[in-house]
């Protein structure tokens, strides 16, 4: 199941840097984190769903690249985001 419009808007409102912000690194990472957590729970139930597992790995790689970019450009924003999302880094 894809992320619902309401849930996505809720995440965007929480992590947006300004009004109408949908593309900042923080918003993208927050949405990806929600999707990754959702797919992770699906994989635990359906262990042989290899197509979903591949999609999960792609999303994890995308999030990793975005976090690396944020760490290079602004360490303080990176640390705040990691802490608010509860990611291990």
Swiss-Prot record:
Q: What GO molecular function terms would the record report?
A: rRNA binding; structural constituent of ribosome
- GO cellular component terms, semicolon-separated: cytosolic small ribosomal subunit
Question: Which GO biological process categories is it annotated with?
Answer: translation
Superkingdom classification of source = Bacteria
Supply the alphabetized keyword list.
Answer: Ribonucleoprotein, Ribosomal protein, RNA-binding, rRNA-binding
Q: Which SUPFAM superfamilies match?
A: S15/NS1 RNA-binding domain
Q: Where is the signal peptide?
A: none
Query: Which HAMAP family does this entry report, sorted A to Z?
Result: Ribosomal_uS15_B (MF_01343_B)
Matching entries from PANTHER family are given as:
RIBOSOMAL PROTEIN S15, BACTERIAL AND ORGANELLAR, SMALL RIBOSOMAL SUBUNIT PROTEIN US15M
What's the family? Belongs to the universal ribosomal protein uS15 family.
Role played: One of the primary rRNA binding proteins, it binds directly to 16S rRNA where it helps nucleate assembly of the platform of the 30S subunit by binding and bridging several RNA helices of the 16S rRNA. Forms an intersubunit bridge (bridge B4) with the 23S rRNA of the 50S subunit in the ribosome.
**Assembly mode:** Part of the 30S ribosomal subunit. Forms a bridge to the 50S subunit in the 70S ribosome, contacting the 23S rRNA.
Q: What is this protein called?
A: Small ribosomal subunit protein uS15
Which species does the entry assign this protein to? Streptococcus pyogenes serotype M5 (strain Manfredo)
Query: Gene encoding this chain?
Result: rpsO
């Amino acid at each position: 199941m894809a992320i619902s419009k309401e849930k996505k808007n809720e995440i965007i409102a929480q992590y947006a840097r300004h009004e109408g912000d949908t593309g900042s690194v923080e918003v993208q990472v927050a949405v990806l984190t929600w999707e990754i957590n959702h797919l992770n729970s699906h994989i635990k139930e359906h262990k042989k769903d290899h197509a979903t597992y591949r999609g999960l790995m792609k999303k994890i790689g995308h999030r990793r690249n975005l976090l690396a970019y944020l760490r290079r450009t602004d360490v303080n924003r990176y640390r705040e985001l990691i802490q608010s999302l509860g990611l291990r880094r």
